[in-house]
């Protein structure tokens, strides 16, 4: 309503959506910016303000500093313009969005699938446990897996519904093994192959997978999951002649050196950037502007990655999809991930 009062049209999701879908929506709707209020994987008192620019990536310098400068100039909140919702809607400055964006987002995700036929072959066998940690990933992760044909997705019932207090968790972080307690209990019950957890704003993915030798569920670090997905995507895109010209993988300087080895093995350029996924998103924009290099994948050690360019921020929904496709590929060959 503050935006509307200043003559700026705003699209508002009618209910919860994951952070990467906002990044997608900014681009899809041709917006100049996007705003997301979230605490991400932190406790609710850390609720904060994420800003995305017209390319769908989080703002970098100098825009981030300029935004804070404007905020600090406000000394009296009563001077900030506002208007009623009814007036904003009547003026065409306040518009709800929802299912139409969901559908477009799902279709973009599906473009990243390499072997849909393999998913169908093992759909009756592969068992997946998933928890959204009371957050926004619940509907989109389940939807994309169902639409791709995965038949056995078991959601942790205690953590299925949105809960801003994260009642069942000390810390809703997929890096924390304790956060997987309920998911691992369910995995034992259903004899799951893999366990997935997305953080509350669904931009990071945590994984456990069954060890074929011990039968125990083993945790993956962000480096491990990122490299597994990277190797699968680069290998299978190369094998199916779906690798673009001048392919580029982008990772951060604190991500494992294995990224360089994998990229070199498939003749993919590796670019390393500063810590923070916003710098990976920035690289995609620069490639497009220069007309040189085609982004394929971007992993970071802190459990985030992005396959494709539909969004410009880490995306746990596309990561879940890619991981499950890889798991299906290996299961068909009698292997676990």
Protein language model features and the residues they cover:
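Short Gly/Thr/Asp-enriched flexible loops that form oxyanion-binding sites at enzyme active sites
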Residues: 1-3, 46-53, 203-223, 259
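N-terminal small/polar loop signature for handling phosphorylated ligands or for N-terminal nucleophile
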Residues: 1-46, 149-207
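Hydrophobic alpha-helical scaffolding
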Residues: 11-12, 53, 57-61, 94-100, ...
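Gly/Ser/Thr-enriched, mixed-charge loops and adjacent short helices
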Residues: 47-181, 185-187
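Glycine-rich phosphate-binding loop plus the immediately following alpha-helix
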Residues: 52-82, 223-247, 251-262, 316, ...
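Phosphate-binding and adjacent anionic-ligand microenvironments
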Residues: 188, 192-194, 216-218, 236-337
